[in-house]
Amino acid sequence: MDKMQPIGVLDSGVGGLSVLKCLHQMLPHEDFIYVGDTARTPYGTRTEKEIRSFVGEIIDWLTAKNVKQVVIACNTLTMLGVDSLRGTHPFSVVGMSKGAQQLLAASPHKKIGVLATQFTIASGLHKKAILAADPQAQVYPVACPKFVPLIEGEQFDSPELRQAIAEYTEPFKKAGVEAVILSCTHYPFIKEQIEADLGPNVKVLDPAAATSADAIVALKEEGLLRTEGKGHLQVCCTADLARVERLAGRMLPVDDCDFSLIDLKKN
């Protein structure tokens, strides 16, 4: 393994671009290869068997690109168990941080909201992680099945999105929630709208920074952290290249990016 090798980042669609943004900011010397499986998004409503099969294809594709690390920029995939991938490949695998300590620090009365996909909410793992850190915490998990299709469909100014945000945040308002975590990497695309809906007294948190910090720790431990040169971004998707380029423009310095349409069955 060589420190000049790229870092792989994967997601079910465009959501992971929000994590790639943070990774690029915190690791400016690294090269990244991002894979968004836009042909089969969203993963949050898929069966576990389907999801594991899709992830296996992406991991195999990235392995052939000689990546030195893989960051799973998707909470649904992280919930399936990053541990099952560790040790089975010649690189470190980093999943999304649950952000428990970050949430508790931002919530004086320990009233916490979780916005996520149906799969992630059903797993119960975010709630368990928060309660393990503080058994007195009150956790309000809300599944948001409408968000990903609206974000992937670029419906950022639509009444449908405004209605969905109001619907999903209503339980938080009733409960007096003080901090909310965006436990799906798509949701930072609409973070400002969610913040506006909840008001200035509620902190809306994105776990991308904590995830990026985990990636840095793993690279340092393996002696693979680059400290010189300008990093490059390669953004790959399995469908809808033009749409991915537009959405990437909301998160990334597109002049530093190469975009390509890929077939995961070919390397």
Where are these regions (language model features)?
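Non-catalytic structural scaffold of enzyme domains
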Residues: M1-N267
